[in-house]
Amino acid sequence: MTTSTSTSSVSTLNRECLCTTINPAALERELAAALGDNELYRSIRATRPHLFSATAVFVTPGQVDKMRAVIEAIETVIATPTYRSAALARASSAAAHDPHSPGVFLGYDFHLGEHGPRLIEINTNAGGALLNVYLARAQKACCQEMHGLTTGPVALAALEEEFVAMFRSEWRAARGELPLARIAIVDDAPATQYLYPEFVLFQALFRRHGIDAQIADPAELEIRNGRLLHADGTVDLVYNRLTDFALEEPAHAVLRTAWFDDLALITPHPHAHALYADKRNLIPLTDPEWLSTTGAEPVVIETLLQGIARTRLVERAHAETLWAERKRLFFKPAGGFGSKAVYRGDKLTRRVWEEILAGEYVAQELVPPGERQVQIETETTAMDGGSAGREAVPTGTNAGAVLRPTAMDGGSAGDAGAVLQSTALKYDVRCFVYAGKVQLLAARLYQGQATNFRTPGGGFAPVFYPPVNEASFTDGGSAGNEGAVFRPPAGETE
């Protein structure tokens, strides 16, 4: 692959490169180096076999540049008083409180189709950044085309430092030069969360940088003498992984008080969610007439209209029109997250449609995700007459095949009774962003109508592209940023 990589050549790689790029031994070493043992790696393999895909996704520098342009255009509009007053007016009371910090780990999720990248949604508690750092470091070059590729504008070796600096920047923005001594990583029943391994990795990362860190359920927090406490120790900063974005649930009352009374810095926070992640924000961001009232330049408006899936509010007054157009629409709850209660219009029943009309939903233009061809190991049965000696099963129906969850260990086609099935998985690309600057790109491979971690061969995957025009992608980048370039791990064959 050359620096003039075209969309067609990248599509060919995503369609025809069936190589396994993950190096399980390297991933085990990365996680063991972070934690001091390999227990986390073993736990992930045993309990989360579809967390990591065994393959990578390829994109072009042009696609990356377009995603960056959309992100910058959104930041430009969000900075305007017109936008901010409109977004906060429809948000919860908690959102009105401004901590004067941007909030860590915004996730801009894109579908990459034939008409270029289109933004689907923005998340303010985007998970997976640190997991994807270790995953990207554990890749091996499967072919000559992979040489010289990068996974983002920041060098992989520098990303952990970048993330810690981000939290320190949040702290300084709100607290000045006061020392940041203790962080609580907070979620409901954290040990049961699918991304709990990332909590453990962040805890270790903070501690390596001289910051005490604890993983806590909100019920373990208390307020005493004007301080937020966990296990009798003062909490300076809460790394908030909750999906109660307005801190409205009774179980989060202590955090809500700490938020309003500035007893601790909470990030990501309700203010950022109201400005970025409420899906109703995508309505004005794809309305040219409204955008013109913000004072945005024509080039900014055009970038948004081309780069964001058009979004409308679901209202009973327009129910008949929306129902007629439903096959071209995707319906999402305005304050939702992930795949919870989302529906493809062509799958809707009248009963579900009535539930949508009774709730707060947006209707978004259906933008198909990209596709990545992968090989998954299957066990043949008498139904397909298969044998262990067959090299591959053609793409198509899985009749008679039992999928084997081998994504994380790269598969083992030599197992008795196993063959390789070629199948197409969908993918989206997530840009992890802080203060308007992209830190890392990652993909999620899946089957079904929305991303999940239940698909054999699916899960997080690194995104590779030639490092062209890095200087325009981030303030700290340059075309000669050798630290960001993908190279095979030392001692590994290609």
Model-derived segments and their meaning:
Residues M1-E494:
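Preference for protein termini
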